Amino acid sequence: MRLFISLPVLIVVLAMALEGPAPAQATPDLSSTFENLPDKLKEFGNTLEDKARAAIEHIKQKEFLTKTRTWISETFGKMKEKIKTTFA
């Protein structure tokens, strides 16, 4: 009984696989590719701009932290030296 039911299902699946891609899955023609090109380029440009801005912002923040850390260490060193000369 199971073979009797599974054989038609297997034939239908095999027929669907061999008939080829559906029209929606077919490769687009050249004109539709050129029509979508400006939109894709604009999207690519926006993505690139966002990533560049984020990278620059990250670098600025990192540089700010480095400068702050350097300033704090220099100030602490000066205070330490002043205390040594005052109490020595």
Swiss-Prot record:
The keyword tRNA-binding does not apply. Its main location: secreted. Disulfide bonds: none annotated. One of its GO terms (cellular component) is very-low-density lipoprotein particle. Residues 1-26 form the signal peptide. InterPro entries: ApoC-1_sf, ApoC-I. Keywords: Lipid transport, Secreted, Signal, Transport, VLDL. One of its GO terms (biological process) is very-low-density lipoprotein particle clearance. It is found in: Secreted. GO terms for molecular function: fatty acid binding; phospholipase inhibitor activity. Pfam families: ApoC-I. It comes from the Eukaryota. Inhibitor of lipoprotein binding to the low density lipoprotein (LDL) receptor, LDL receptor-related protein, and very low density lipoprotein (VLDL) receptor. Associates with high density lipoproteins (HDL) and the triacylglycerol-rich lipoproteins in the plasma and makes up about 10% of the protein of the VLDL and 2% of that of HDL. Appears to interfere directly with fatty acid uptake and is also the major plasma inhibitor of cholesteryl ester transfer protein (CETP). Belongs to the apolipoprotein C1 family. This is Apolipoprotein C-I. It comes from Bramus lutescens.
